[in-house]
């Protein structure tokens, strides 16, 4: 029979109650107390990381995610969230590592492919970025974001014919994105 830790349960339910009531500062305080008692608790680390990010303290959130991903059972989404925040903080090489780690754990995590593509663009590693963004479009073919970034990369690489193909494709399901790309690139593309 599994033993229930009532102290841990009390911390957890207090934090949940405060979150539901909109008292996020109290929830943070409760979760910090929980970490004092249970320093490696995944629930407390993940919840604090999320609440710190919501409160605008991205570095504190990164610190919590780093502790969370250091656990042997770290999940792909924890690595993805860490990468996302690192990219926001312009920690590009660290973000790339985190996205790659997320993809090692779950190669179908489309958001991580997109994040990886963005970090590679920022490092001007365009060939790798194209591969990552294409993988995202395979997993999420109707999401315009990776298509948009692909077109931008092709324009940066002086490949307008590839950008035209993407704009034409976007006109079929996301005409606003297609129009934005036409304005930004100066290309006028007829729908096929």
Predicted regions and their residues:
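Alpha-helical segment of the N-proximal tetratricopeptide repeat
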Residues: 7-56
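Terminal, low-structured helical/coil segments at or just beyond the last alpha-helical repeat
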Residues: 2-8, 14, 156-192
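Canonical tetratricopeptide repeat
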Residues: 13, 47, 81, 115, ...
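Structural signature of tandem alpha-helical TPR/SEL1-like repeats
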Residues: 20-33, 55-67, 88-101, 123-135, ...
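Helix-start (N-cap) detector for alpha-helical repeat units in TPR-like alpha-solenoids
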Residues: 7-8, 42-43, 76-77, 110-111, ...
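TPR/TPR-like alpha-solenoid repeats
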Residues: 17, 51, 85, 119, ...
């Amino acid at each position: 029979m599994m033993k229930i830790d009532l102290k841990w349960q009390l911390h957890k339910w207090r934090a949940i109650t405060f979150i539901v009531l909109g008292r996020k500062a109290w929830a943070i305080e409760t979760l910090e107390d929980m970490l004092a008692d249970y320093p490696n608790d995944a629930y407390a680390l993940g919840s604090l990381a999320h609440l710190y990010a919501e409160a605008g303290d991205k570095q504190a959130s990164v610190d919590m995610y780093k502790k969370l991903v250091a656990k042997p059972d770290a999940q792909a989404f924890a690595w993805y969230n860490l990468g996302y925040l690192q990219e926001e903080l312009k920690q590009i090489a660290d973000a790339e590592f985190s996205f790659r780690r997320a993809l090692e754990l779950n190669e179908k995590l489309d958001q991580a492919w997109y994040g990886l593509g963005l970090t590679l663009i920022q490092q001007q590693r365009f060939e790798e970025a194209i591969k990552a963004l294409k993988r995202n479009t395979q997993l999420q073919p109707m999401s315009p974001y990776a298509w948009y970034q692909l077109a931008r990369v092709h324009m940066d690489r002086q490949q307008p014919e590839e950008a035209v193909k993407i704009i034409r494709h976007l006109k079929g399901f996301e005409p606003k994105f297609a129009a934005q790309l036409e304005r930004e690139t100066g290309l006028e593309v007829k729908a096929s």
